[in-house]
């Protein structure tokens, strides 16, 4: 959607999965000529530099990012998502919505942002970024906190390890 509106926040995202396990991930941001990449067990990179997730350990000092479906037909579900958005906005330094799941997750992996969550997402939008985040040291789960996130229905939380459990609790109204 961003690309079609000439908003320069979009990416080319490619992942390789073998026997049910993500092996390679690349997210390329052509607007900024940034290539985020990872190979399972070999670390994560931004262009030619190794990268790590932030060391955030306090939600109140964390900057978050999320995505919202642009075609949600169920008002009740969208209202619930907006309540969570508001709650996490109030408990953090803020929540951004950039419009590209691949960029969102890559920014968490690089330490620019501290946490990401999204539900009702396509697996091709999160596969590369999820591996990159894992290899950069992020905790990556589904919205319920299960590490086996790459199965339908697709949802994802990727964050600095020090704030992950708190984000998951809030997403599940267990605060």
Each language-model region and where it sits:
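DPxDG-like acidic metal-binding loop motif
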Residues: 1-45
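An extended, acidic
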Residues: 52-175
